[in-house]
Every structure is written in structure tokens, then in C-alpha cells.
Amino acid sequence: MSRRYFGTDGIRGRANGLITPELALKVGQAAGLVFQRGDHRHRVVIGKDTRLSGYMIENAMVAGFTSVGMDVLLVGPMPTPAVAMLTKSMRADLGVMISASHNMFEDNGIKLFGPLGFKLSDDVEKQIEQLLDEPMDKKLSESASLGRARRIDGVHDRYIEFAKRTLPRDLSLDGLRVVVDCANGAAYKVVPEALWELGADVISIGVEPDGFNINKECGSTSPEALCRKVREMRADIGIALDGDADRVIMVDERGHVIDGDQLLAVIAQSWKEDGRLARPGIVATVMSNLGLERFLASEGIELVRTSVGDRYVLEAMLRDGYNVGGEASGHIILSDYATTGDGFVAALQILAVVQKLGRPVSEVCHRFDPLPQILKNVRYRAGRPLDDAGVQSAISDAEKRLNGHGRLLIRPSGTEPVIRVMGEGEDRIMVEEVVDTIVDALGNASAAAA
């Protein structure tokens, strides 16, 4: 069965476009029915980020879940990994995060977690999709069996304590000046507080959400403001989270960006030295730079690659017994601590290495020289541009030109109508030329189909 709603990271789209109150209500009903297993009273944890449409979707989902007899625990704006953690901690049957992650406020989405805090499998998502297209009137609970909803206090402190416990008890961030950019998103309350409790000198930006400014010129996808602030405040390091705090990008004392590949290199090498790697390898995606792979090989660490998407990274980690994985975009999964990507917990591991080594972040976090990599996005309105004959010809010509001295990766986004074109190789000029040729062909195909 083709998937109409679920992409690589839940359901995502324009608020009041794809993501309507009607859809949110039905997702609540369908997911509630799928997860009513056993004879106990069933519960769902619902969190959200700070975008305006979160109120609308939250209320619709509460109506959906309670209409099929599920109790709802509302935790308000919280990071996605916090919702996953709370789902397991509070013995809930299901967790929901209302967020479109790094997208702008106009979009929103619904991410679902099972009772152990893991994202749902494809099979479970298909079960929910099937119910979305069925009438619900005969599946609703009797009046006496309807669910209840309540807001839960103290959840911020729970997540702060959870994050702090990922560091050794005797490790302090005293003496470290940290600028943190919370993207005006879900982490704006918890992360600055946690850093302060750990002893850091904290300077916060992106902590004034108004419903519209999430990810707007801030956060992990727009680190320029953080780079400027780090230089201005002469900070030791900067941390940029995205809107739901499941990814992180960092900045060194010079204001230079440290991407997810460099963060993976730091954590992998440090954990290997400390005997903390479950296996002599880590998991990343096909988007990770070849420079990372070469560096890890020199350290005796294997790089296992998956398709793009943190869910595929986690699947490989769980299947093959790895405990470190991630993406260049900043999704870092440390399965000793979390069931999903946790930007703040990953950042804490980097801060721990910085404190341990006592060296500038620019030295600690530059483990390899990345090969030139060009990534461009082509947005399209209709059709299947990748099937166009002109596009296929451009791709074939580009591969011949690279002739084994680089690689191409061309794929549709799983969350939006965008085709991502990535080229990588030792000759930057050649890589730029072949990527631009493919981008032009895709643009022409998209225009012809519109």
C-alpha cells in the first residue's frame, strides 16, 4: 500500500493545508485504536514546539485520542527527544510530538513514538494510515469510557535531570562560556537552564518564541546569528539546535561552524578511547562526507552507511549493535542514552571532551578535512522530475565526468516537494559544474510539468 500521509519523519505539511484539525483528529483516533493493547487504562503523551498552529493541532489530537478512550498527558513545548523519553518514563502507550522540526512556522507535523520511546515502524504507520481512510463512527468509545486530558507539571525538570545524568557526576562546565541558540523553539526553557546548572556561563539567543519566529534566521539551519554572537561575546563554543531540538550544529571560538560529521568524529574517537563504543564502528548516512569515513578508518572505526533519515540510522544501530550514529545535518543518536536524535545530549558529549582535553574548540572539533561537497535543493510543484529524459541524461553525463573521482547522490526529500542534489569529490570546480548541470535539468523538467 502506498503511503499517503507518512513520510520519513512522521506526517508533515502546511498547517491548514495537509495538516488540518480534521486530519489531526483522525490521526489521534487511528493511533489511539492501534495502541489500545492490553486491559490497562491507555495513555498518550503529547508535546509540541512553539509554532502558532501547535495549539490547533494539539486540541484536535486531544479530541481524537479521548474519543477512542485514551487518556492524554499534555507536556506543552518540549524537545522531541524529551517527549520520547517521557513516553517511556511515564509508562504511556504512545507519544506524540507536534512539530515540523527545522521548517518555518507555516508548516507543522505529527511524530509518533511507541511505548519504549522509539519512532514507529513502517508496518505500524501503515496500520494507522489504513484507519485514516475508514469511517470512525462505529469505533468510538461509549460515553462512560471516554478519555481524560490533563497538563503535567514538572516535565522540564525531568528532562533537565535526564540530560545532566548523561555526563559524569564530577564533570563541571565551570569556566566555559557557551552561547546557545534554541531557534525560538521547543528547547527555549530547558537547555539554557540545564547548561547553567552544569556550571557554564550561558548566553542565550533564540529564546523568545512568538509563534511565528521558530527557525527564522536562527537555529541549526541558520547558524549565522550564532557565529556572530560567539565572536562578539568571545565565547568558547556555540550550540545551535533546531525547532524541536533533535538536531544540533556547533560553532567554535572563531565563529566557524562544526557540522554533524565533525561531531560524530569527535564522539566516536573519544568513546573508542574510553571503551564506550559497543562495536568498533558507527552508523551514518550516504550524505556523510568521505572525509569522515577516511578519518574513522585511520582510527580503526568502521563507518556503516544507510539511506538518508535518522530512522534508518537508528534501525541499523539497533539491528547491528552500534551505539553511536547520526547525520551531517546534526541528528546525533546515542542509544546508550536516548531512543532518538537528541541535539542537547550530543552537545553535552562534545562539551565533556572539550573540558577533558582543555584545548580550544577549534582544535578539538576539527578532526578531518572534508572533501568539497555541494548540496543544492530543487523545489518542484508537480510531476516526477527525476523521470524526465533530460534529467536522466544530465545525471549520466555527470557520472561519466566524475569517472570514479567523486560521487553523486540525487534523491527526493521525504518531507517536502524538493529534490536534493549532492556532489562530492576532490575537485571542487568540477563538482560544482556537474551539480549545476543536474539542477538546471531538474528546473527545466519541473517548469515543463507545472
Curated annotation (Swiss-Prot):
Where are residues bearing Phosphoserine located in the sequence?
A: 101
Which enzyme type, at the first EC level? isomerase
Write down a Pfam family by its short name.
PGM_PMM_I
Documented EC number(s)? 5.4.2.10
Q: Note the InterPro entries from the entry.
A: A-D-PHexomutase_a/b/a-I (IPR005844), A-D-PHexomutase_a/b/a-I/II/III (IPR016055), A-D-PHexomutase_a/b/a-II (IPR005845), A-D-PHexomutase_a/b/a-III (IPR005846), A-D-PHexomutase_C (IPR005843), A-D-PHexomutase_C_sf (IPR036900), Alpha-D-phosphohexomutase_SF (IPR005841), GlmM_bact (IPR006352)
Keyword Magnesium set for record: yes
Q: A GO molecular-function term, please?
A: phosphomannomutase activity
Catalytically driven reaction(s): alpha-D-glucosamine 1-phosphate = D-glucosamine 6-phosphate
Q: Which HAMAP family match?
A: GlmM_B
| UniProt record similarity statement | Belongs to the phosphohexose mutase family.
What is the name of the protein in this document? Phosphoglucosamine mutase
Write down the species. Answer: Rhodopseudomonas palustris (strain HaA2)
